[in-house]
Swiss-Prot record:
Cited HAMAP family: Undec_diphosphatase
A Pfam cross-reference name: BacA
Signal sequence bounds: none
Gene: uppP
Keywords: Antibiotic resistance, Cell membrane, Cell shape, Cell wall biogenesis/degradation, Hydrolase, Membrane, Peptidoglycan synthesis, Transmembrane, Transmembrane helix
Record-given protein name: Undecaprenyl-diphosphatase
GO terms for cellular component: plasma membrane
InterPro entries: UppP
EC number: 3.6.1.27
Reaction(s) this enzyme catalyzes, per UniProt: di-trans,octa-cis-undecaprenyl diphosphate + H2O = di-trans,octa-cis-undecaprenyl phosphate + phosphate + H(+)
Similarity section: Belongs to the UppP family.
Compartments where found: Cell membrane
Organism: Moorella thermoacetica (strain ATCC 39073 / JCM 9320)
Amino acid sequence: MTVLQAIVLGLVQGVGEFLPISSSAHLILTPWFFRWPDPGLTFDVALHLGTLIAVVAYFWRDIIELVLSGLGQPRSQDGRLFWYLIVASIPGAIFGVLFEKQAETIFRSPLLIALTLTLMGLGLWWADRVGRKRRQLDDVNLFDGIIVGISQALAIIPGVSRSGITMTAGLLTGMERETAARFSFLMSVPIIAGAALLKLKELPLHEVNLAFIAGVLTAAVVGFLAIKFLLQYLRRGSYLLFTGYRILLAALIVAVFWLRR
């Protein structure tokens, strides 16, 4: 993999991780479209380390306050939210361990990705229409953590989108658009950190080259900008834009797949 390819994939990861369009799907589709070698799941996880840096850099004050409150004052508002986020991370971690092999093989099919992009895009649009969109982060409770956490477990399938499925679940529990996005971003910290640590400890040091580092740094910078954009956009916009994009991308996948037969 060249440095340019790594930078492109880092850009794709930075945008796709936080916008509800599925970073894992785009990391599979980009090499497929351009006929590049598949970088594999380990490089995917390394790029997630870049977006972990992005979310920690953006929310570092919130994260410190949540951790201190969770450990020192677990009954406080921030303390409870900290433990809700931990609970929400458990289903995704379990599914990630149980279905790791499938994530590396059958779940990487372009046609399956086209299907999940479409279905979850429609699901996000529906949730945005029917959700009450009244509840803020201070209103989140344990039930919300469980529901959003269970939904996150489905994100192991490329095309579902971790941010997309958790925002969908958040909207269905009555969260405001921006609140659903913030909760999704904060709960990404433990799940991404866990996945990255598990995979990176298996990574041979000789594979950590300039391309590898360039991809991670690009994902971090672009991811930070993507978070800022989405939170500002959702104050006045809806999720319909992302539904339309997902459906158009799914149609493009099917067309390319058919032409290459």
